[in-house]
Amino acid sequence: MWINQQDLGIDNIFTDDLIYIESWGPKYENRELLKHWFNEWNTRGKVLIWDIKQFFHKDNQTIVEWYFKNKMNTGNFEEFDGISLVVWTKDNKIKELKEFGCNLNNYNPYEESDIPQFRDEKVNWF
């Protein structure tokens, strides 16, 4: 859906009253707002990769680990690893989805000292 920039079934996947929270703060509290966000976002950027690495499912909950990369119309690229916590209804629709992001640019702050040496760089938004 995101890769193709087409709504291929939001109505069939999500409940009317879903709660969808992005890793950096935005919260969409119903399906119509989620559809608006999807359509509006796709005017500003393109998802290049959204690969599922693994998932764990139990009862009505799923945890999904994924890798994400996009290119915005400004020319900026964003990429990060993420996890989604998904809660399902009895009729297999998503009623809650919460994203968490993880920076790909990892390092050991204790590599050269017992005192942490943090990089002087902009911290990602998640």
What are these regions (language model features)?
Residues 1-12, 16, 117-126:
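Short, low-complexity N-terminal intrinsically disordered segments enriched in polar/charged residues
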Residues 7-60:
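A solvent-exposed, acidic/Ser-Thr-rich amphipathic alpha-helical stretch
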Residues 48-51, 65, 78-84:
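Short, surface-exposed coil-to-beta transition loops
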Residues 59-68:
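A short hydrophobic beta-strand element
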Residues 77-108:
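A contiguous, mid-protein "functional segment" used to position or interact
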Residues 98-126:
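Low-complexity, intrinsically disordered terminal/linker segments enriched in charged
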